[in-house]
């Protein structure tokens, strides 16, 4: 007859075996060496690594690059024809963009619109100026 302590030891040893098997599986996949990635697998891996930043297929170069230089090697050359690791994939990620401040509609005033000048026909302006002159001259005469 099997006692409860014997059952516990049998159960524990089987759990220990499965635990060791899981650990070996996860550690071997986590420490796996570089692998080759081509086509959709390469794009999926770049999207996973780079996220929202996006990525380049060729390494970004400076503005002064000329076409006379040696042809560039891209991610396909490095990861499809040869094997590459995670660090190599990260080199092709686009740089982070600075976060834009969120603008609230409530924060904007309704008076932010530029004020337009009131339009007055030119004839009205001349009449008003002449009336002012007359008033000014009559005022001076009464003094």
Swiss-Prot record:
Residues 74-94 are annotated as: A. It holds the Pfam family Insulin. Residues 62-73 are annotated as: C. GO terms for molecular function: growth factor activity; hormone activity; insulin-like growth factor receptor binding. InterPro entries: IGF-I (IPR022341), Insulin-like (IPR016179), Insulin-like_growth_factor (IPR022350), Insulin-like_sf (IPR036438), Insulin_CS (IPR022353), Insulin_family (IPR022352). Its main location: secreted. Disulfide bonds join 38-80, 50-93, 79-84. Residues 126-136 have a biased composition (Basic residues). Residues 33-61 are annotated as: B. Residues 95-102 are annotated as: D. Forms a ternary complex with IGFR1 and ITGAV:ITGB3. Forms a ternary complex with IGFR1 and ITGA6:ITGB4. Forms a ternary complex with IGFBP3 and ALS. The insulin-like growth factors, isolated from plasma, are structurally and functionally related to insulin but have a much higher growth-promoting activity. May be a physiological regulator of [1-14C]-2-deoxy-D-glucose (2DG) transport and glycogen synthesis in osteoblasts. Stimulates glucose transport in bone-derived osteoblastic (PyMS) cells and is effective at much lower concentrations than insulin, not only regarding glycogen and DNA synthesis but also with regard to enhancing glucose uptake. May play a role in synapse maturation. PANTHER family: INSULIN-LIKE GROWTH FACTOR I. This is Insulin-like growth factor 1. The lineage of its organism: Eukaryota, Metazoa, Chordata, Craniata, Vertebrata.
């Amino acid at each position: 007859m099997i006692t409860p302590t014997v059952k516990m030891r049998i159960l524990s040893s089987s759990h220990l075996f499965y635990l060791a098997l899981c650990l070996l599986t996860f550690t071997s996949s986590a420490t796996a060496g570089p692998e080759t990635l081509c086509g959709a697998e390469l794009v999926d891996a770049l999207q996973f690594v780079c996220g929202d930043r996006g990525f380049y297929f060729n390494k970004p170069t400076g503005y002064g690059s000329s076409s006379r230089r040696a042809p560039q090697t891209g991610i396909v050359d490095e990861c499809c024809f040869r094997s590459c690791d995670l660090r190599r994939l990260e080199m092709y990620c686009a740089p982070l963009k600075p976060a834009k401040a969120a603008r609230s509609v409530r924060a904007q005033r309704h008076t932010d619109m530029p004020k337009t000048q009131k339009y007055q026909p030119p004839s009205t302006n001349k009449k008003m100026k002449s009336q002012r002159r007359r008033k000014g001259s009559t005022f001076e005469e009464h003094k």
